């Protein structure tokens, strides 16, 4: 049998596969498969981070190599450049993996970028880095993970544009996304413990979880929501927004691991703080779905880019799987928001909420 890392292409061998079987092949990757570097963990994380960027084509879900290895590069950037975590067992010829060597060469050529977050590296430099990593890393890891998962996860052709994830595997990864992420982090950390010195291992799991940094400046989304939709009330409680306007991830960032327009709403500080890492109550789904239908029609480059892979069923499915992963529901805190605004108990609630929620939710 040809070694997995030598494979140039592979077909999905079965589309009728049980969850038990998929757990079996993932657990094999996490524990039993042979590894000289961490690329399999990196590829699994990049796929999980890209679940909501995949598009249904026929009976499978497509994701481009460009999108996969942009996440792959971003995830490795902090681990290698910021935290100095080695990612490969020494093979007698080199102690650095290709992704480490690419980063080291770029940092040696321009020391300044070592201090930068991945997203703020110059676009030309960042694209060149992603292209080089995609070229060097995919020829080894894509076939290797394909073989370890027995051809049940995806089909691929290294000469073409990306992977095709089977529908069964896609639904499985959505349903068990959080559990798969935790197992992947744990297995990745166990591997890193074997090849790194003690000092860099401090807070290792936190370093892995934070390898995909959350974007902190969401002001551009705030302005689009205010300008294009004239949103001047809290999405959840309907109270008038003041200067302290929060851009909230409708489905928490900790689950989605991405910043996209279709998942943003404006909220008051009280609701944003109360909601925290919860999903909104189910009654809010219709409201955001209606908003997103309007948003998809806006002539704005950022909005267009964010909605390219969006479909009408996305929010319902995301909400469902986030709930299955254990996320609690948040409901409106009308009374608390009114009290904070100095409004007497119950005066604002009915009128504001009726305008902020779908009419059919009221008797």
What do the predicted segments below correspond to?
Residues 40, 226-232, 260-264:
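Short metal-coordination and nucleic-acid-contact micro-motifs, chiefly zinc-binding Cys/His arrays
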Residues 233, 363:
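Long C-terminal interaction/binding lobes of large macromolecular proteins
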Residues 282-358:
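C-terminal structured domain segments
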Residues 235-266, 275-290:
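Histidine-centered nuclease catalytic patch
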Residues 31-38, 228, 255-259:
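Short, solvent-exposed segments of well-ordered alpha helices
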Residues 211-222, 247-253:
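Short Cys/His-rich Zn2+-coordinating modules
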Residues 1-218, 283-294, 299:
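Mixed-charge, low-complexity interaction segments
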Residues 48, 52-55, 77, 226, ...:
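Hydrophobic/aromatic-lined pockets within catalytic cores
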């Amino acid at each position: 049998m040809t070694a997995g890392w030598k494979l140039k292409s592979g077909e999905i061998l079965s589309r009728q596969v049980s969850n038990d079987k998929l757990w079996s092949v993932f657990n094999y990757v996490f524990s039993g498969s042979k590894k000289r570097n961490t690329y399999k963990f990196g590829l699994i994380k990049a796929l999980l981070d890209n679940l909501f960027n995949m598009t249904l084509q026929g009976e499978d879900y497509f994701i481009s190599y460009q999108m996969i290895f942009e996440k792959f590069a971003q995830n490795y950037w902090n681990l290698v450049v910021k935290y100095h975590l080695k990612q490969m067992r020494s093979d007698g010829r080199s102690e650095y993996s290709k992704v480490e060597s690419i980063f080291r060469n770029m940092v040696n050529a321009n020391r300044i970028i070592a201090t930068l977050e991945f997203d703020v590296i110059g676009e030309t430099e960042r694209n060149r880095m992603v292209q080089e990593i995609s070229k060097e890393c995919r020829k080894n890891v894509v076939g290797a993970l394909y073989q370890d998962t027995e051809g049940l996860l995806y089909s691929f052709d290294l000469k073409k544009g990306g992977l095709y994830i089977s529908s069964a595997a896609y639904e499985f990864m959505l349903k068990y996304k959080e559990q798969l992420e935790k197992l992947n982090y744990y297995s990745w950390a166990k591997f890193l413990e074997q090849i790194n010195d003690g000092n860099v291992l401090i807070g290792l799991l936190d370093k892995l979880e934070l390898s995909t940094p959350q974007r902190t400046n969401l002001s551009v989304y705030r302005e689009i929501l205010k300008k294009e939709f004239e949103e001047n009330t809290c999405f959840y409680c309907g109270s008038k927004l003041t200067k302290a306007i929060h851009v909230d991830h409708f489905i928490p960032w900790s689950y989605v691991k991405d910043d996209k327009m279709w998942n943003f709403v404006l909220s008051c500080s009280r609701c944003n703080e109360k909601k925290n890492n919860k999903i909104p109550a189910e009654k809010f789904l219709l409201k955001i779905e209606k908003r997103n239908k309007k948003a998809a029609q806006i002539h704005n480059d950022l909005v267009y880019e964010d909605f390219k892979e969006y479909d009408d069923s996305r929010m319902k499915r995301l909400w469902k799987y986030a709930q299955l992963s254990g996320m609690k529901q948040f409901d409106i805190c009308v009374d608390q928001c009114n009290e904070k605004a100095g409004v007497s108990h119950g005066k604002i609630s009915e009128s504001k909420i009726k305008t902020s929620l779908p009419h059919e939710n009221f008797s």
